[in-house]
Amino acid sequence: MNQSTLLNLSVLVLFLPLLGFVITLLLGKKFKAIYLFEILILISAFAISSVIAFTKLNYFTDINLVEEFEWINLNNMPIVGNVPIVLGIMLDNISVLMLFVVSLISMLVHVFSIAYMKGDLRYNRYFAYLGIFTFSMNGIVLTHNILMMYIFWELVGLSSYLLIGFWYEKKSASDAGKKAFIVNRVGDLGMFAGILILFTTYKTFTFDQIFYQISQGNLPFDSGFWLTVTGILIFSGAIGKSAQFPLHVWLPDAMEGPTPVSALIHAATMVAAGVYLVVRVFPILTGDALTFIAIIGALSAFIPATIALTQNDIKKVLAYSTVSQLGYMIMALGVGAYSFAFFHLITHAFFKACLFLGSGSVIHAMHHEQDIRNMGGLRKKLPLTYATFLISTLAISGVPLTSGFLSKDGILAGTFAFGNLTGNWIFAFVGFFVALLTAFYMFRLVILTFHGEPRDQHKYDHAKESPFVMAMPLAVLSALSIFFWYTPNPINADQGWFLSKWVKAPELSTPVESRYNFMKNYSEEFVEANTHEIVFSESYTEAMHEAHIPAMLISLLVAAFGILLAFTMYQWKKISADKLADRIKPLYNISLNKWYFDEFYNAVFVGGTLLFAKFLAWFDAAIVDGVVNGSAALTRGFSKFSGKFDSFVVDGLVNFMAYLSGFIGLLFRRFQTGKVQTYLMLVVFSIVILLFLFKSF
């Protein structure tokens, strides 16, 4: 298979879900089983993406395949001049891996939804929305320029709004859809500003051309500071889409959508798009920008993990877990663990999708009950769901022999190496502490849901294992949470095919003055500003290697402690969770109330907006209406004056002229007698007067 065939197949994978969306939406009311066409489309897209990934990763490993064409030509535009706008797709190792993941999970979610959404009044429309979402996400993955990425980025936002608010009859669902849409607009606005700075500076949207020009020393406004600002602005799009602090508040509310949607959008694809964006623009990020990114990632990993400790809605526990794990990935990128951040993006997509679909299986069996306090003992009723849920929980907790152990260990090693190199250990501390919290709250979830005795006997008695179309995706996703798909070594992924062959360190574009910490820089290993170099310094690479064993041992200890603590409190009940909550009531309330972010935003932004609206209403009524009413009164007064002036002056003058004309006419009418003698006398009299006058001169 040659390169052009791979590119053509990738275009087919891109547009197949769009075809499914159009057909399903248009024919959904006429053909009840049209959803099967959409599912067939997704199965085909997955099969093709598998072929693309296998061929690219094995036969074109170190070659980036690009296909592009000129869309429009901007002639004589202000600032940028004449610029062609090029559209295209790029197949590199990262994009084909993401394409495979998106296609696989989307297909499994489609299959799972056959049974889960059965009986819904808008059954076909639901599958149509899944199709447009998959198309949008594939577009983000395949594009080779940031303009196309932004277009598909907004399409993902639209389709997620449709899916989150799918049950719009519920006020909570419609509010959640609006909240997600509005909060994401905040981040997208910053991203758009960053894109505009790049375009006005480099006259192109294509990633490779932007990277090349930066490597040549061409910086926005000739300043490294503005390159940092541009990187942070683009990252703000990831803050919104990946639900990072402080724009993380929309994701838990988005659980109002159908549970399979949560697996697709909020675990595997949409929220992963933000991390993918940072991975894609990584070469232009300066040291300052990466430090900012690491701080945001650390806060996003820590805060939601503390919130997940006290949540009782099965989906919201997983939602806050998702935000925390995404924060892990963002923090990893900020401290230089680039490959492991992307590795964790892939592994997390599988086990978190399995957890969400597993929660859907539980909710389906419990007749839409989501409160884990009303569950218990379900491992006997749902053995397959329990087994797959447990495997995925072990993976997210970082237990050996799972994929999560390998990827999380790499991230923790990265923070450890960063601390060794810079003396800044805060990121390592956050990483290990969050690993402990993750193991604790995830096993709390497993124990309260599946272990112990039933707490709602009626629902427990009617619970039964999910049908095959729901169980099969769980089995596939849990199997992909095992280590051997990524490396033959169960404790170290460095020499596995995923990291050693497929995902390699990126090249630098940033100038030497903007590099520090884990980057090559002039004080350590001098490189010219106009050359492409692998991003990592030798000392950082050595620090990463040295950090592997201690990071692995510490991560095992904290994971074991978290799991043991969960069993002690909720399985064996040696420690009373209620008594502990009473002892630390202030901290418990902070966690239970989600750090009061929603209350703060409602008070400051929503309340502030409403207060500003009231001020504008007052200003409109008192000032604007006053000016308008005053102008109206002035106009009325002037019109009355004009009326009087017209009546007395203008009309008076006209009437006077008419009267004068009449008077003169009356005067001269006396001479019009009709007698020739009289006229002759007047002529003679006139001649006499004229002669007299001429004689006088």
Question: For the regions a protein language model found, what residue spans apply to each?
Answer:
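Hydrophobic transmembrane alpha-helices and their helix-loop junctions in integral membrane proteins
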Residues: 108-149, 158-469, 486
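Transmembrane helix-loop-helix hairpins at membrane boundaries of multipass inner-membrane proteins
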Residues: 1-9, 26-128, 202-222, 249, ...
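N-terminal signal-anchor/start-transfer transmembrane helix
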Residues: 13-28, 107, 239, 243
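Hydrophobic alpha-helical transmembrane segments of polytopic
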Residues: 10-17, 34-48, 95-102, 126, ...
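Juxtamembrane "helix exit" motif at the C-terminal ends of alpha-helical transmembrane segments
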Residues: 241, 398-403, 408, 484-495, ...
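Hydrophobic alpha-helical membrane-insertion segments
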Residues: 40-58, 187-198, 389-397, 473-498, ...
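Membrane-entry segments of alpha-helical transmembrane domains in multi-pass membrane proteins
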Residues: 2-15, 31-36, 83-101, 139-152, ...
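Aromatic-capped, Gly/Pro-kinked transmembrane alpha-helices
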Residues: 80-84, 491-557, 568-697
